[in-house]
Amino acid sequence: NRNNRDWWHFADYGCYCGYGGSGTPVDELDRC
């Protein structure tokens, strides 16, 4: 499962609902 393997790639991926996240989701993957 790619999402489980690569979750950490999104830790600093303009995260709307991730670590240090704010503002608008950058894309569908960044939505909660």
UniProtKB/Swiss-Prot annotation:
Q: Which keywords annotate this record?
A: Calcium, Disulfide bond, Hydrolase, Lipid degradation, Lipid metabolism, Metal-binding, Secreted
Q: Which Pfam families match?
A: Phospholip_A2_1 (PF00068)
Residues annotated as signal peptide: none
Record has Acetylation as a keyword: no
Q: How is the cofactor bound?
A: Binds 1 Ca(2+) ion.
Q: Name one GO cellular component term.
A: extracellular region
Indicate which residues the UniProt annotation says bind Ca(2+). 16, 18, 20
Q: Which domain of life is it from?
A: Eukaryota
Where in the cell is the protein located? Answer: Secreted
Q: In which tissues is it expressed?
A: Expressed by the venom gland.
| Purpose of the protein | PLA2 catalyzes the calcium-dependent hydrolysis of the 2-acyl groups in 3-sn-phosphoglycerides.
Q: What family name appears in the similarity comment?
A: Belongs to the phospholipase A2 family. Group I subfamily.
What is the protein's given name?
Phospholipase A2
Q: Which organism is it from?
A: Micrurus lemniscatus (South American coral snake)
